[in-house]
Amino acid sequence: MAASKNLAQWLAEYNESHRHPQNKALHWLCVPAIFFSIMGLLINLNAALAVVLTLAVVLFYRRLSAALAVAMVLFMVVCWALVWLLPPGYALYWAIFVLAWIGQFVGHKLEGKKPSFFQDIQFLLIGPAWVAVTLFGLKTEAR
């Protein structure tokens, strides 16, 4: 069994298909929007399931970096709060989800490379980490 990648390795691989300035800008906007929309959909579907999946995601991030896990927990708390403040339902979250994915694919068309998650599904969680690491200036060295 191959050793799992550390945060620096994941981010280096993610960066390979996120170099074009417009693609990066679209990802800065769309990745958090997708994350938020998924949380909104899950919370509206089943709050208990949303809690369990949120904890699993936090554990994934904690395995990579304690600082990253803290940053992502803060973002998730903001997402949860916004979802609870907004009217219940699915339409808003589906609209955000679809529009943000369109933005992602436009960015990758500009980049000329396929989205990373086609290579490994875990990149769906690395995208938000990429935004958080840059936004908060988190260190990415191996533990």
Listing of model-derived features with the role each one plays in the protein:
Residues 1-17, 21, 109-143:
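Membrane-proximal soluble regions of multi-pass membrane proteins
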Residues 3, 39-50, 80-93:
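Helix-coil boundary and interhelical linker segments in multi-pass alpha-helical membrane proteins
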Residues 11-42, 57-67:
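Membrane interfacial helix-start motif at the N-side
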Residues 23-29, 69-72, 121, 128:
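Membrane-interface loop-to-helix entry segments
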Residues 41-45, 69, 84, 112, ...:
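Transmembrane helix-loop junctions and nearby membrane-interface residues
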Residues 47-85:
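Helix-adjacent hinge/juxtasegments
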Residues 57-68, 72, 97-114, 131-134:
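Transmembrane alpha-helical segments that form the membrane-embedded catalytic/substrate-channel core
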Residues 76, 80, 90-104:
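Hydrophobic transmembrane alpha-helices
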